[in-house]
From Swiss-Prot:
Keywords assigned by UniProt, alphabetized: Ribonucleoprotein, Ribosomal protein
This protein's name: Large ribosomal subunit protein bL27
Gene Ontology terms describing biological process: translation
Protein family according to the UniProt entry: Belongs to the bacterial ribosomal protein bL27 family.
UniProt xrefs under NCBIfam families: L27
Family annotation (Gene3D superfamilies): 2.40.50.100
PANTHER family in alphabetical order: LARGE RIBOSOMAL SUBUNIT PROTEIN BL27M (PTHR15893:SF0), RIBOSOMAL PROTEIN L27 (PTHR15893)
Pfam families reported in the protein's UniProt record: Ribosomal_L27
Molecular function (Gene Ontology), one example: structural constituent of ribosome
Tree of life domain: Bacteria
UniProt cross-references to InterPro entries, sorted A to Z: Ribosomal_bL27 (IPR001684), Ribosomal_bL27_CS (IPR018261)
Keyword Repeat among record annotations: no
Length: 84
């Protein structure tokens, strides 16, 4: 009778590593063109003025300036960069 015994704990203790998502540059912070402002999955925050969005929804600065988080409408946020 081939039974497997004592294998329970060897199948546990696996987890995926964190994806390092989130806000990288906060409101009022100075950024240079190309700096990443937010890494996100989907468009939790939308691109505003002077920022671009990558194919993985990463928001980055297109010009040198200061980051400003704003409301796009009642339930959507956007982030913009304004020149110094």
């Amino acid at each position: 009778m081939a039974h497997k015994k004592g294998q329970g704990s060897t199948q546990n203790n696996r987890d995926s590593i964190g994806r390092r998502l989130g806000v990288k540059k906060f409101g009022g912070e100075f950024v240079r063109a190309g700096n990443i402002i937010i890494r996100q999955r989907g468009t939790a925050t939308h691109a505003g003025n002077n920022v671009g969005m990558g194919k993985d929804h990463t928001i980055f600065a297109l010009i040198d300036g200061f980051v400003k988080f704003e409301r796009k409408d009642k339930n959507r946020k956007k982030v913009s960069v304004y020149p110094a």
